[in-house]
Regions:
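Glycine-rich adenosyl-nucleotide cofactor-binding module
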Residues: 151-165, 170-171
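Hydrophobic face of beta-strands forming the core of extended beta-sheets/solenoids
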Residues: 163, 169, 175, 183, ...
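Terminal amphipathic alpha-helical/low-complexity segments used for targeting or macromolecular assembly
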Residues: 1-154
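Extended hydrophobic/aromatic segments used for targeting, binding, or gating
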Residues: 205-210
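Conserved small/polar residues in nucleotide/adenosyl-binding loops
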Residues: 226-227
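Active-site anion/phosphate-binding pocket segments in diverse small-molecule metabolic enzymes
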Residues: 179
């Protein structure tokens, strides 16, 4: 029994070391590509999807912009136009991409149902909704409010997640399941926060000014909590 426990501990320690080793963006991207190639080999019926979303791209940001733009495509703003907006944001504010990378590592570390780095990237709507918000937030600070609101609206329709473009959200965020999450205009969510579905960071009722909650670093908010 002791040898079994020690072996499991060694495997867990190795996984923790692996997370530390992929701190650089390139390492994370290469790890994701290896995972997705293995997925494509194992499930050939999805090979086209895996190639379109990950394997056909040279960089993490290229893949992310393609994936999100494909999800947000509409009859009034094409996926091509949305992708150009995202690439503009990534170029002007590299911290947007860095935050996405940190989010993936946080989800992989905290969510026991997540067994790879590519899983949240490809399949978790909480991760995807948050990355669109990061672009909308950048647009908001460029005074491009209409476009920021459009992205917010699309996220609400597609993912059932409603985050005001002005809301300040840190890195290492996990929106687990994410359905029904609402985050208001003056809310602040610091680094390493986890929240489950149905969480509302709502207003106090004031007509203007600072009126939404401030969630400090490392907090866990359980499902259906309204603050």
């Amino acid at each position: 029994m002791h040898s079994s426990i020690n072996k499991r501990y060694a495997l867990e320690l190795a996984e923790e070391n692996k997370i530390a080793e992929i701190a650089e963006a390139g390492s994370l991207w290469q790890a994701m590509r290896r995972e997705v190639q293995a997925r494509a080999d194992f499930e050939p019926i999805m090979a086209t999807f895996f190639h379109a979303t990950v394997l056909n791209h040279d960089t993490f940001e290229d893949a992310l912009s393609y994936l999100l733009a494909s999800e947000l495509d509409s009859s009034v703003v094409s996926s091509m136009a949305i992708r150009e907006i995202m690439q503009e944001a990534y170029q002007a504010e590299p911290a947007v991409i860095r935050a996405a990378e940190i989010d993936i590592k946080a989800i992989r570390a905290r969510d026991p149902a997540c067994n790879s780095y590519s899983t949240p990237f490809l399949f978790y709507k909480g991760f995807q909704a948050l990355q669109v918000h990061r672009v909308a937030h950048w647009l908001w600070h460029q005074e491009r409010h209409s476009l920021a609101f459009f992205l917010q609206s699309q996220v609400n329709v597609i993912y059932n997640v409603d985050i005001h473009p002005a809301a300040q959200i840190g890195c290492g965020i996990m929106l687990d399941h994410a359905t029904g999450v609402v985050i208001g205009e003056t809310a602040v969510v610091e680094d390493d926060v986890s929240m489950l579905h149905g969480v509302t960071l709502g207003g106090t009722g004031k007509e203007s000014g600072d009126r939404h909650p401030k969630v400090r670093q490392g907090v866990l908010i359980l499902s259906l909590i309204h603050i």
